[in-house]
Amino acid sequence: MVAQGLLDFQYEADPSSRGLTSLGGLPLYFDLIKASGLGAAIRRHVRAAGGQGWLDIQMVLAVIFLNLAGGDCVEDIERLERDGGFSAILRAIEKDLLSRAERRSLKSRWRRERERATPSPSALSGWLERFHDPNSPKAVAGKAFIPAVTEALRGLWRVNQALLEFLHEHQPAKSATLDMDATLIETHKRDALHCYKKFKAYQPLNCWWAEQGAMLYSEFRDGNVPAGHEQLRVLKESLRHLPESVKKVALRSDTAGYQAELLLYCGEGKDPRFGVIEFAIGADVTEAFRAAVLATPESEWKPLIRRVDGKSYVTDQEWAEVVYVPNWAGHSRQRADYRFLAIREPLRQLELGDEQELPFPTQAFAGKGLHKPFGMVTNRKGPGDGVIWWLRERCGKSEEVHSAMKSDLAGGQLPSGLFGANAAWWALAILAFNLNAAMKRLALGESWAAKRMKALRFHLIGLPGRVISHARRWIIRLGGGTQALATILDARQKIRALAHGPAG
């Protein structure tokens, strides 16, 4: 036998590989899809598929499983199709996820017997293109333009709303802290536009629900649209997606949210449902703001102390509340109480004149040297340092979530040159993210809540096994010991209980 490599082992194809799977834990998500009513929500809201071929529910679930399994692109659906065990279990339980009318329609939707368990890449691409409006004006460089949301895409967001209502029903929270932040998705699509960082990109504006650890809403945008553009409109749309039992909302944003209409809307209680919305938002460091910072007495500056696990750590930053009333705040009809906080961070080891080359504003303080100033505006009560740390909670989490969407899931590799198809792909990646959030929080337990997809694939989803049919039952026999099996069985029992209503 010819040596295959340096060491004494050989690779061979296994002719008896039928039923083998490397995704032994992935079918656990079928249980949660059934319990959450996700299939019914897809059936009720998504209307993209035609009268022939694959159903909308089959398409949506295929993309969700592609994301969970680690796929990056439409072509990776073939990885699921070639997994004999997963394909077998998908075919076997598909009927339990379809309505009676859908099951009856399957035969008439296909001219000959269906051979695949999952849609082909070409079928999936064609379905995604149905989310695009061919009559929508084309975006052009130099102008911020956001295409209207198509009815098909709106349907996907209604499905996401239904999933979050299920999560909220079993993990209720009367308040919602919303973090608004944009992220750049680099692309080489011909019609994509350049972002502020000078590469081609799309830039969705996202609204994260901190208490539920889930994405509430996202507006897909071209890369040349500024993050703060029409942020109030996106906030209003996000608020409409919150469950009825949520009574209070708070908002956090970086300086992209420093928009007069947004601040006045929140501060003056203009929202008909939530009234005053508490917020902390990064403020622009304008010349007027810098003057107010310089006018603040040294006695007002306090060290910014970080508290971790009951211990206090003095940072090199200081903060102070500054007397500053910008024009928009002076026009407030309700005389809302806006507070401005300043943070200063010392800049060390700078040569004379180097501050002119820095990509951020600097400020010299008498006797204190050169500093990098930051600003924020809030209508929250309480100590200023507490508000600062509350705002900063969003920063690391936003970066983590965006990384998960673009690297752990398939959101970072867009499938099409059509805006609407890419918007649907992004929405489906978010749907997969939120389904996984529900799995961790409601079924797997607290120890799994902080785990990212890499850990879930290693310990749960990517388990080796064999799928067999015996006595009219389908069985997934897992390899790799009993710990993973115990985790899955416990999760299945919890999901079974979820299907019968909220705890308590």
Which functions belong to the PLM regions below?
Residues 225-288:
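Domain-level cores of phosphate- or acyl-group-handling catalytic modules
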Residues 48-51, 181, 249-258, 420:
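Conserved short loop/turn motifs at secondary-structure junctions
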Residues 2-11, 15, 275-407, 493-504:
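An anionic, glycine-rich sequence signature occurring as long contiguous blocks
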Residues 412-478, 482:
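Basic, amphipathic alpha-helical segments enriched in Lys/Arg and hydrophobic/aromatic residues
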Residues 80, 92-96, 249-252, 443-453:
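Short, glycine/acidic-rich hinge or "gate" loops at secondary-structure transitions
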Residues 1-201, 206-224, 232-244, 272, ...:
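Dynamic "connector" segments at or just before major functional cores
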Residues 77, 384-424, 428-439:
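Short amphipathic alpha-helical "interface-anchor" segments enriched in bulky aromatics
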